[in-house]
Amino acid sequence: MSKENRDTGRAERAAAVRADQARKERNRRIGLVALIVVILGAVVAAGTWYGGGGSADTPSASVAASAGQGSVIAGKAGAPVKVVIYEDFQCPFCRELENSTRDFLRENAAAGKVQVEYRPIDLLQSTYGERAMNAFAAVLAHSTPAAALKLHDLLYDNQPYESDSASVSPSQILGLVKKAGGDNPAVETALKTQDAAFFQAASEVMSQKKITSTPTVLIDGKPVTGGVPDIVKAVENAVG
């Protein structure tokens, strides 16, 4: 098969995945709106309003970070449980998994119970996903693993809707890099062009591992099946 045919096939698969995830995201939003309406109705009926800080601004446990092959790793190599997460920075289900597991995994990684490897891939081929992944690659290569891990988190915290993927500008991405502590002249230079080698390596991993959806999660080398709730349950059961 020619390179042109391979690229065309990959683009078609990415378009199909984007369409499927967009449909699922629309359904999820409809469900969330309905739930919010019910909750607000209950609050009004009770005549009370809860106003307080949530956990979104609470920092995760401090954990040692190291660089992998196209990835950032949280936790020690000797941890009894190994979790690998293949993810796309634009994938809404990856963000859902992040929101559901980040604190749990970091706390247990800090305690030596699990090692977590975050491996970004460009499955959806979206504007935000590619800008985010390129920034991650730049920080991973030219700054510190700790900054790359922090940037990873910030990129999910600031993920736009898929329909608004281009809304986060390169200057805003740079702002996240600075907030993560990963800014330096080499990183800023790297941000000006796409890291073709990093993207190609991620594409090859996708082909080798036959990854067709995100998030794809491996626990001790074995893939976890099901949706995000199933993955969360499997991770929590494995770590204990």
Placement of each model-derived feature along the sequence:
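C-terminal cap of thioredoxin/glutaredoxin-like
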Residues: 3-32, 37-45, 51, 175-240
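A short beta-strand-turn-helix
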Residues: 64-81
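C-terminal region of N-terminal signal peptides and the immediate post-cleavage residues
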Residues: 44-65
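Conserved S/T- and glycine-rich ATP-binding loop of Class I adenylate-forming
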Residues: 83, 91, 217
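Processing junctions and N-termini across compartments
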Residues: 85-88, 211
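A generic local structural motif
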Residues: 68-72, 102-103, 202-205
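Structural alpha/beta surface segment adjacent to cysteine/selenocysteine redox centers
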Residues: 79, 87-89, 95-172
